[in-house]
Amino acid sequence: MAADPTELRLGSLPVFTRDDFEGDWRLVASGGFSQVFQARHRRWRTEYAIKCAPCLPPDAASSDVNYLIEEAAKMKKIKFQHIVSIYGVCKQPLGIVMEFMANGSLEKVLSTHSLCWKLRFRIIHETSLAMNFLHSIKPPLLHLDLKPGNILLDSNMHVKISDFGLSKWMEQSTRMQYIERSALRGMLSYIPPEMFLESNKAPGPKYDVYSFAIVIWELLTQKKPYSGFNMMMIIIRVAAGMRPSLQPVSDQWPSEAQQMVDLMKRCWDQDPKKRPCFLDITIETDILLSLLQSRVAVPESKALARKVSCKLSLRQPGEVNEDISQELMDSDSGNYLKRALQLSDRKNLVPRDEELCIYENKVTPLHFLVAQGSVEQVRLLLAHEVDVDCQTASGYTPLLIAAQDQQPDLCALLLAHGADANRVDEDGWAPLHFAAQNGDDGTARLLLDHGACVDAQEREGWTPLHLAAQNNFENVARLLVSRQADPNLHEAEGKTPLHVAAYFGHVSLVKLLTSQGAELDAQQRNLRTPLHLAVERGKVRAIQHLLKSGAVPDALDQSGYGPLHTAAARGKYLICKMLLRYGASLELPTHQGWTPLHLAAYKGHLEIIHLLAESHANMGALGAVNWTPLHLAARHGEEAVVSALLQCGADPNAAEQSGWTPLHLAVQRSTFLSVINLLEHHANVHARNKVGWTPAHLAALKGNTAILKVLVEAGAQLDVQDGVSCTPLQLALRSRKQGIMSFLEGKEPSVATLGGSKPGAEMEI
């Protein structure tokens, strides 16, 4: 029996059939030229992705089948951590069996998730690594279909690219056929302008660089390029030098994102020769990812809005308050309004039936007379058995109005006639809340004597004791705690009265509440204690009393920040000193890994750096991605901060996770004085990071002649190769910066010879 012709052409490439997989094939992606199914292998119990070409029927032409097989064979040979693995071909149906990527394509993720900056940068960097690998193959393998749909993400959101096989299509198609086919495949936006302008030129590596730039734009903005434009409009715009809008680019983005935008612009340059190669791109994306990962997130100070009733007083001296007047004016009975306004002047205060009715806004004569402060007239009206607890449309009872207006006689009169001391308005405020807000201990005592709930909580959970603590009314607070008010009740965000008193720095209230059993370390929802709030606001006396009373100086909030972290980040020298005296830890890390010294270095607080150093803080403490305080200072701080840390004993040669030393960062940032300072403290000029770059490589890449001269004088060698055999000399030549070129020509006569041999030729594809 003759062998299957397909098998004859497969060589060592494994062949699968539908029977090798379980019956349930799940469609996970579909495009104009292919469908991707998820299927489980029967024996291996492993999930695979099977990319089928619905345009190729079972009796497809042998050339089409051969193309698919050739493509699979080519892809299977390529082994790299950021390129999807190929396991073989499927005969029935015809397709390629490949590694299953749990999170699907970047295209799908961008449309359904908001990605953090760190993840966006990592995807950009890993994509550049994959493309650099393809371009470094001999001969270079061009992708020619780089787009979010072909950037796949595994279960940990790491990148693997697929579908780098369009070169055959291009060889077999006319330019117009290729463009039309690209439009159908949804990749027109990723085609560079030279493809529209130069009819005979074959695509080169810079084609992929342009496509990569559009991918960067999509990742940064999470939008679709050229949305709303038809095929011809896109071609015309791109050919004319126009690109996706930069309007979404925001000044609020981190500085590293602004630098990524600069890289993106260079990658989509109209002139292919001016676009960087992927080797250079990986250098920049690695730098930017490393810098972004070291960013310090200091929790923002959240102002505590002063709690007040949302209602204005219904009575103003000598006249009817505007609110109550407006409610009366809004009534649908103008005649009644006139009668009601005359009540205070009438000797006969017995109202007619129509005057006792409730109107649209539910304001009654009793509300009006209470707002007027007319005790005797209210007494006469109450004698006619009116509803003493009648409520306006906003829930106001006469007693609430009297309490808000600080009318103790009216409150007593209304309570004597059975007014409910716990009836609340629409915001949940009881009369006792108003008395506490006003510091009216007389009315508060009267209300409590008539059954007012001492721990009544309004809609957002505030009690009268919270309000007394906020407004520094010790008289009311003492009355409330004498009536067993609970000092540990939490409002909606978790604040106790002690949180409120500490935030506003009301020392007398802090002392009173702590003496009455308030929990010193009670936590809000964000886990902040009263001490956190007092430190954040700089309330020294409140801090002092809390610490004396036994508050824990190292309590951590939801970001892992203790009071000392906050004080160090905000430059509160005296508070730092006080916290250290009460035993605050110098080495507690936040969730990002930052110690108080990291934060002081990041913010540039020199006094606090010296204080922490004198207190024996670890100058080499490792934070996020193993950055020391000196790394943060070299990257973000002023030269004086770098100098202070070095004087205090910081190690100038500490290497972070990717091998970057403070000298690398100072060179990358072009801070000349920091470079000098680090070298004077014996920074290693030959230090190499994980990809083999020395500080001299970075100086050459940045085109900074002054710093490169200093490094050379300190012994830097210009012929040291990095991980891809590139020297600072070669980077300098490729940067084409005149100052660097002039310096090198004078410093190193052999540069001309090196230039003649095209030092970057093996990388510049």
From Swiss-Prot:
Q: Name one GO molecular function term.
A: protein serine/threonine kinase activity
Reading the lineage from the top rank, the first entry is: Eukaryota
Q: Which InterPro entries is this protein grouped with?
A: Ankyrin_rpt, Ankyrin_rpt-contain_sf, Kinase-like_dom_sf, Prot_kinase_dom, Ser-Thr/Tyr_kinase_cat_dom, Ser/Thr_kinase_AS
Per UniProt, the keywords (alphabetical) are: ANK repeat, ATP-binding, Kinase, Nucleotide-binding, Repeat, Serine/threonine-protein kinase, Transferase
Reported EC number(s) for this entry are: 2.7.11.1
Q: In residue terms, where are the ANK repeats?
A: 361-390, 394-423, 427-456, 460-489, 493-522, 526-555, 559-588, 592-621, 625-654, 658-687, 691-720, 724-753
By its UniProt entry, which PROSITE patterns does this protein fall under?
A: ANK_REP_REGION (PS50297), ANK_REPEAT (PS50088), PROTEIN_KINASE_DOM (PS50011), PROTEIN_KINASE_ST (PS00108)
**Expression tissues:** Highly expressed in brain and weakly expressed in placenta and spinal cord.
**UniProt-listed GO biological process terms:** cellular response to retinoic acid; regulation of cell cycle process
Query: What CDD domains does the entry give?
Result: STKc_RIP4_like
User: Which residues make up the binding site for ATP?
Assistant: V28, A29, S30, G31, G32, F33, S34, Q35, V36, K51
A Gene Ontology cellular-component term = nucleus
The record gives the effect of mutating E764K as: In a lung neuroendocrine carcinoma sample; somatic mutation
Provide the catalytic activity annotation. Answer: L-seryl-[protein] + ATP = O-phospho-L-seryl-[protein] + ADP + H(+); L-threonyl-[protein] + ATP = O-phospho-L-threonyl-[protein] + ADP + H(+)
**Which catalytic residues are annotated?**
D145 (proton acceptor)
Q: What is the effect of changing R736L?
A: In a lung squamous cell carcinoma sample; somatic mutation
Q: Please give the annotated consequence of changing Q717L.
A: In a lung large cell carcinoma sample; somatic mutation
UniProt xrefs under PANTHER family: ANKYRIN REPEAT AND PROTEIN KINASE DOMAIN-CONTAINING PROTEIN, ANKYRIN REPEAT AND PROTEIN KINASE DOMAIN-CONTAINING PROTEIN 1
Q: Which family does it belong to?
A: Belongs to the protein kinase superfamily. TKL Ser/Thr protein kinase family.
Protein name, UniProt field: Ankyrin repeat and protein kinase domain-containing protein 1
Name its species. Answer: Homo sapiens (Human)
